């Protein structure tokens, strides 16, 4: 399979390289902004799980670059991720864990004591191929993004995050409705129809009365215990609003390259592999396997044992 094969099969991958985006996922945020006008007039934005930086590019392109140089300093964009990424003009990078309160404090400090007007997150776990498990882990990641948003998002702010459509979608929707007046699930055309991926678009942020920001992955706020013992009564049915982007391009379709096509390399390769820490840890572990050696000759066995005292101890009672 040639290197142009993916350019044929994935029109958004091809366009991302031609237009200078680090990943095809940039079009997902662009289409969300086109549909809901999320970024108009904003000056403070947070990109969670930002690497390799395509959504941070979109934020910079829409909020930072259109302004004259003397006015750009008022726009503050911060990208948060445990992994490093190549610099983007107008974007501050913070290598930190989004589940830590200290990360929220660092973000607010970057904004000079103010809070963000929008929080976006395109983070996703490594896929296992088991859809139920993957959707569960993705839901926990979404709740982590929502948790830190309750610390850093200003009243009336917006929140956009990846979600996997599954049986937990209604529960996550219920969680979001506690904090946002307007919530829907959005499917951009840059997201393949064959994928369970979608995005929650939540607007008009408002903390409930008496609510104290906490970790939503460990605390429930829809009071499931109130249904315990009510065997004859079922929880209310939740209908989640769904919005699909109407575009001319289809991410599942193959497009001809055209006569003037010129192959382009990806805009920015990852600085480090996501699994680099695991490689470093396992490199210190001795996982060498010593095969079993069967010796039938008694003289050979004695010579072999004489070469290494540890072998005699290991064999012990096994040698007769």
Curated annotation (Swiss-Prot):
Per the Swiss-Prot or TrEMBL record, the active site comprises 162 (proton acceptor)
> Recorded E.C. number(s)?
2.1.1.205
Q: Out of the domains of life, which is the source?
A: Eukaryota
Q: Which SUPFAM superfamilies match?
A: S-adenosyl-L-methionine-dependent methyltransferases
Its gene is Trm7-34
* Known catalytic reactions: cytidine(32)/guanosine(34) in tRNA + 2 S-adenosyl-L-methionine = 2'-O-methylcytidine(32)/2'-O-methylguanosine(34) in tRNA + 2 S-adenosyl-L-homocysteine + 2 H(+)
Disulfide pairings:
none
Q: What is this protein called?
A: tRNA (guanosine(34)-2'-O)-methyltransferase
Q: Taxonomic lineage of this organism?
A: Eukaryota, Metazoa, Ecdysozoa, Arthropoda, Hexapoda
Give UniProt keywords alphabetically: Cytoplasm, Methyltransferase, S-adenosyl-L-methionine, Transferase, tRNA processing
Q: What does this protein do?
A: Methylates the 2'-O-ribose of nucleotides at position 34 of the tRNA anticodon loop of substrate tRNAs. May require WDR6 for methylation of the nucleotide at position 34 of the anticodon loop of substrate tRNAs. Plays a role in neurogenesis. Requisite for RNA-mediated gene silencing. Modifies position 34 in tRNA(Leu(CAA)), tRNA(Leu(CAG)), tRNA(Phe(GAA)), and tRNA(Trp(CCA)).
In its UniProt entry, the species of origin is given as Drosophila melanogaster (Fruit fly)
Where is this protein found? Cytoplasm
Assembly and interaction partners: Interacts with CG33172/WDR6.
Query: In which residues is S-adenosyl-L-methionine bound?
Result: 53, 55, 81, 97, 122
- Keyword Cytoplasm (UniProt): yes
Sorted alphabetically, the Gene Ontology cellular component annotations on this record are: cytoplasm; cytosol
Coiled coil location: none
Report the GO molecular function annotations: S-adenosyl-L-methionine binding; tRNA (cytidine(32)/guanosine(34)-2'-O)-methyltransferase activity; tRNA (cytidine(34)-2'-O)-methyltransferase activity; tRNA (guanine) methyltransferase activity; tRNA methyltransferase activity
State the phenotype upon gene disruption: Decreases methylation of position 32 in tRNA(Phe). Impairs long-term memory functioning with no apparent effect on short-term memory. Sensitizes flies to infection by Drosophila C virus (DCV). Leads to derepression of piRNA pathway-mediated transposable element silencing, whereas small non-coding RNA levels appear normal. Leads to locomotor defects and a reduction in ovarian size. RNAi-mediated knockdown impairs small interfering RNA-mediated silencing. Simultaneous knockdown of Trm7-32 decreases lifespan.
What Gene3D superfamilies would the database entry show? Vaccinia Virus protein VP39 (3.40.50.150)
GO biological process, alphabetically ordered: cytoplasmic translation; neurogenesis; tRNA methylation; tRNA nucleoside ribose methylation; wobble position cytosine ribose methylation; wobble position guanine ribose methylation; wobble position ribose methylation
Q: Which family does it belong to?
A: Belongs to the class I-like SAM-binding methyltransferase superfamily. RNA methyltransferase RlmE family. TRM7 subfamily.
Q: Does the keyword Acetylation apply?
A: no
């Amino acid at each position: 399979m040639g290197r142009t094969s993916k350019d044929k099969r994935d029109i958004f991958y091809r366009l991302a390289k031609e237009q200078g985006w680090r990943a095809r996922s940039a079009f997902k945020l662009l289409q969300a902004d086109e549909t809901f006008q999320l970024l108009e007039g904003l000056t403070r934005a947070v990109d969670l799980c930002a690497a390799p930086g395509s959504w941070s590019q979109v934020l910079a392109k829409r909020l930072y670059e259109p302004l004259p140089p003397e006015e750009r300093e008022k726009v503050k964009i911060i990208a948060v991720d445990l992994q490093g990424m190549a610099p983007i003009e107008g974007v501050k990078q913070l290598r930190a864990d989004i589940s830590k309160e200290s990360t929220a404090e660092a973000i607010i400090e970057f904004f000079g004591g103010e809070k963000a007007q929008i929080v976006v997150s395109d983070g996703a776990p490594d896929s296992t191929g088991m859809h139920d498990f993957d959707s569960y882990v993705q839901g926990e990641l979404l709740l982590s993004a929502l948790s830190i948003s309750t610390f850093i998002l200003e009243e009336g702010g917006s929140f956009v995050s990846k979600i996997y459509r599954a049986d937990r979608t209604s529960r996550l929707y219920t969680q979001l409705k506690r904090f946002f007046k307007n919530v829907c699930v959005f499917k951009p055309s840059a997201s393949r129809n064959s994928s369970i991926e979608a995005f929650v678009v939540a607007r008009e942020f408002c903390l409930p009365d008496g609510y104290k920001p906490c970790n939503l992955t460990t605390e429930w706020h829809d009071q499931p215990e109130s249904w315990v013992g009510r065997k004859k009564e079922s929880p209310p049915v939740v209908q989640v609003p769904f919005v699909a982007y109407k575009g001319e391009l289809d991410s599942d379709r193959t497009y001809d390259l055209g006569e003037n096509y010129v192959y382009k390399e990806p805009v920015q390769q990852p600085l480090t592999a996501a699994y680099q820490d695991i490689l470093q840890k396992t490199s210190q572990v001795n996982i060498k396997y010593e095969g079993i050696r069967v010796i039938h000759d008694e003289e050979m066995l004695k010579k072999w044992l004489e070469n290494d005292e540890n072998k005699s101890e290991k064999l012990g009672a096994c040698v007769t």
